[in-house]
Amino acid sequence: MKEAELSATESQDEIPKSNSLLIIEKLTKAVCSLYFINCFMVPSVDNLIEKYPKAIIIKIIDMILGAVTISLVIIVFFLYRKNGHFKNENKTKPKRCSKVVCPSCAARKKYPKWFQLKYLLLVSMTAFSFYFCTKIRFFFKTDQTINLHRLSQLFRLQLGWICTTALLFYFYDALILHSGFIEGYRCVNGKGAMSEGKTGQLN
């Protein structure tokens, strides 16, 4: 009942978004995704302009995309601030694991330091996606040749960046999801809730 009342009060406190704001928000997310892909998965063409003059078109598109992205982000920021959505966002709680029996929560409660260290190490290991990003951005710095072999090298770098970045976000979400406060003893092992109830009855 308490959880239902809390959810009801939270839903009442939420400020509804207008249709125009929702459209601009979706457009901004789409443009930001394109800009994100362009920044991290597309090589810089600055070193190709001298050998391939038409590469300047890609450079111009890159600049236009960056300007549009910045403009949309600024517009959404001021619309959020004007309508008071930032206050509502600050009230929202971070997502936590809601499973009754969760091995990750059990490991966190039993070995809290090891749990934090393990996930931080995994996040730091996948952080070498920065290496792939750097190699992609400066792919044409030393060699401006464009052929099938070079494109296959670029594809392997892009695939490596996608995999490492996906792992980075996965482990980061897992770290945040299972790092919340765990009530009681229900997730210590597979029979945590049952064993706690039995020990309580025996005592």
Swiss-Prot record:
* Positions that bind ATP: 192-199
* Subcellular location, principal: membrane
A Pfam family annotated for this chain is: DUF4668
What other comment is given for this protein? Answer: Present with 967 molecules/cell in log phase SD medium.
Q: State the organism named in the record.
A: Saccharomyces cerevisiae (strain ATCC 204508 / S288c) (Baker's yeast)
Q: What is this protein called?
A: Uncharacterized protein YLR036C
**Transmembrane region positions?**
60-80, 114-134, 157-177
Q: Which GO terms describe its molecular function?
A: ATP binding
The question of whether Nucleotide-binding is a record keyword is answered with yes
Which controlled-vocabulary keywords does the entry list? ATP-binding, Membrane, Nucleotide-binding, Transmembrane, Transmembrane helix
User: Could you tell me where this protein is found in the cell?
Assistant: Membrane
Q: How does it sit in the membrane?
A: Multi-pass membrane protein
Cellular component terms per the entry's GO annotation: membrane
**InterPro entries in alphabetical order:** DUF4668
